[in-house]
Amino acid sequence: MPSLKDLRNRITSVKATQKITKAMQMVAAAKLRRAQNAAENGRPYAERMAQVLGNLAGNLIGGVGAPRLLTGTGQDRVHLLVVCTGDRGLAGAFNSSIARLARDHANRLMADGKTVKIITIGKKGLDVLRRQFRDQIIASRDIRGNKPVDYPFAAEIADDILARFEAGEFDVATLFYSEFRSVISQIPTAQKLIPAELPTAEGAAATGAGSDAAMEFEPNEETILETLLPKNLTVQIFRALLENAASEQGARMSAMDSATRNAGEMIKKQTLIYNRTRQAMITKELIEIISGAEAL
């Protein structure tokens, strides 16, 4: 049985930990509001841009003259995985769930004889994936110095991916991130970046986002797509980073809330044990005193 001193030290240690987790919960809650607003404000622009490009692409007869960012290389041999996680832990399963999704995807590709290359955004993704894919990781970036996430940081990532694509380093690029739904719901997501997956005109009409208006484009569709597709790549990466930032703060807030409540339960349990142990010791001492008095 632990001594009273050991129990007091244990209770003091748990209380100190509880203060830390409570503070982290409050900080995450404050950051979550800003990150959530940024993610929600970025969605309409990214979705509408994809719809516009989808309408443009739908006007190309047989895909003739379409940019390579839309059609791809015509091959499916080399896949680039862009894995976005966070730099810090203590966020529940946020980082591990994204890394697991990317790892499973990479394993399936390699089992099919494909070549896999990986770019990691965030230290935690790098830490997890390099255990198995050290030779496949061709680049990595930290995001700690870029919070809150900004557009130029997304543009740097997009420019790097675009340069590697133009150099023929890969055929298909897929982005992995966590889509923010709510504080308690973040969905690990895989989105194909190259060749670009754009909504069709039929799909846009089904969701009410399309238009029946006849449109004329000046200059032609090919020229517009050639200009906008690289920008769309940056926009989609920026949106993913915003979703990731909100998901990370939501996951951390939830994890720290759970840790704070668990610490409270542990304090209650240890305090009860302490009181019972102290009461038993006092009772034992009283019995010894009474027994000694009776002996006299």
Swiss-Prot record:
What CDD domains does UniProt report for this protein, alphabetically?
F1-ATPase_gamma
Q: What does it do?
A: Produces ATP from ADP in the presence of a proton gradient across the membrane. The gamma chain is believed to be important in regulating ATPase activity and the flow of protons through the CF(0) complex.
* Species: Methylorubrum extorquens (strain PA1)
Q: Tell me the protein's name.
A: ATP synthase gamma chain
Question: Which molecular-function annotation in GO is an example for this chain?
Answer: proton-transporting ATP synthase activity, rotational mechanism
HAMAP family xref list: ATP_synth_gamma_bact (MF_00815)
The record describes its membrane topology as: Peripheral membrane protein
- Gene assigned in the entry: atpG
Pfam families in UniProt: ATP-synt
- Which terms are listed as keywords in the entry? ATP synthesis, Cell inner membrane, Cell membrane, CF(1), Hydrogen ion transport, Ion transport, Membrane, Transport
Complexes and interactors? F-type ATPases have 2 components, CF(1) - the catalytic core - and CF(0) - the membrane proton channel. CF(1) has five subunits: alpha(3), beta(3), gamma(1), delta(1), epsilon(1). CF(0) has three main subunits: a, b and c.
Q: Where in the cell is it found?
A: Cell inner membrane
Similarity field: Belongs to the ATPase gamma chain family.
Q: Name one GO biological process term.
A: proton motive force-driven plasma membrane ATP synthesis
Example GO CC term: the record gives: proton-transporting ATP synthase complex
Keyword Ion transport on this protein? yes
Q: In its keyword annotation, does this UniProt entry include Cell membrane?
A: yes
